[in-house]
Amino acid sequence: MNNTNNMSKKALQKLELTWIGKGDEPKLEPRILIENPEFSYGDPNSENMLIHGDNLLALKALEQDYAGKVKCIYIDPPFNTGAAFENYDDGVEHSIWLDLMNRRLSILHTLLSKEGSIFVHLDDNEVDYCKVILDSIFGRNNFINRITVEARSPSAFSTVNPGVFKASEYILWYAKNKSDWESRSMRIPSPRDTAYNKYIVNREKDESEWVFIPLKQAFLEFINRDRLDKIDVFLREIYNQCRLFSKSQIEHWIFENFPIHLVFNLKQVSNYLHGKLKIDEYDNFWQAVYMYILDKCSYNYSERDIDDFVFQNSQSVFRETEISDDGAGQETVRLKYLSIEKPTQVFKLERDNGLDSVYVWNGKQISFYSKNVEEVDGKLSATKLLTNVWTDVSWEGIAKEGGVKFKKGKKPEKLLKRCFELTSNKGDLVLDSFLGSGTTAAVAHKMQRRYIGIELGDQAKTHCYSRLKSIIDNEQTGISKAVNWQGGGGFKFYTLAPSLLKKDKFGNEIINPEYNANMLAAAMSKQEGFKYQPHDSIYWKQGQSSEQDFIFTTTQFLTLEALESIKDEMQAGETLMVCCKSFQQECKSKFGNITIKKIPQMLLGRCEYGKEDYSLNIINMPVDETEQDLLDDNLEEISVQALRDNKQSNDQPTLF
């Protein structure tokens, strides 16, 4: 009974999501990455990486060198629709998916910089479960937002089933440390707000001289600017000479005296003016007919033309907004009542700290439209603040983006562009471990971010490689025009090295024969926490963990003479770890600053060697027949055997 009570109390201490297999974390092997120069392209000094292999092993391979260095992560993992789990019951199905995500998100959290953030794109099958995992790994206090994306629209084909049509997908957005993360706002295109319907003719002058007219009048005068004088003469002459004319006489008079009639319907205008010419006083007549004539003289303009005029002159376009006695500042409220007493006068309140001045007229504040106009994708546009509901990112036409086909999984380049604009700057590192058709890497490349993309499937070559290659060659789909993409740059193509250890025919674990000396040295450096960077002239300095701590791996028998020779070359304060298959007994503990470890014995039990795939085969991406032919005929896997016998040279692929 006491036992049960204790367990209940313990359970109440922490609320958590659990699943089958939780806590049974694999001991991942930190593999090295081998460049395949055949599929690297462009700038040979590029830091961009395209990795073909299991993404959990690839993330582990990156962990040592990239922990805390990634500014933005976007992942679009399998949605777990159920079709891929037909052999499992519901509980196991969810457990598999949750376990897959938990392992990867844990490493992704490690890779993020303290200012970084992650976007996880999902549908409603697992989004709520995934949020609990993200809360656990990142902390609920680091949750930024749940973004709802309108990913599809109803069509005859997609709406045959009854019920509410599912149009949305979701992006969970978390910071590594919200206190270090930079919050950014963004404005997006929107329809022009027609409530801003007044215009200041002489905005550049002192506010005491401002002249106000309706926005429509300002626009019509702008497009008729070459005929305003003629319109003025026309109105004055017709008032002076035609007040007693009949409709037909007015029509004839206009026809004979003013070619301006060619731009409007003469009979319609004559009938209208006949009634207005009876108005006493020319000024009253002018007020009654000016806008009508101005409009009739205008032709072939559209709402887009009005929009462009407003955007170009937004600093002169305004609306009047109410001033709340409770919400506004004390001085603003004072000017409100002062302006009511003097309704024709504009009052100005200058503010400190770079804030815009406040203008009050006739008891209301003048709000300029300029704050709602920004340059978007190279042109001025009406904008509104971005919210967490994204309905303006179109999925239509994305099949052609990047020149690759990718059914049921391709994301718009515009979507990734927005994510990167919210979270990163040029030169920052972004990562996608479910690269798919390569959209994340494509957008990062065009936006001049550094990137790492990981993809297990064949589309790493058929889609990602070819897409990035065409981008470097200046393809112009997707966001290319919006960012003025001109081509250039490069990337390196990597594959995961095979497992370091394998079993021989007797069941004993041995160093994998596919490893040559350089690969083994790189692998041992990674295993022991050193960075593999062979010294130009000192052969035993193959890697280092600090300025004075080095590692040396050799497959040869280590003699005391060889060890003493190394010791003589070492500088004061330097330490060395030697990893070798065998060594002379006298070498053991000979020097206090040299540690000797035997391989493969030192590696046994550390990792899960020999496992190549942690993907659980959740989905198989569709490959077109033409793409499959390309894969079969033109693309070959990197030959590790060929690398094994190569000596280190300038032509040797990079080991990472």
What do the predicted segments below correspond to?
Residues I452-F656:
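PRPP-dependent phosphoribosyltransferase catalytic core
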Residues T4, L12-K14, N177-G402, E413:
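Active-site-adjacent helix-turn-beta-strand microarchitecture at beta-sheet edges
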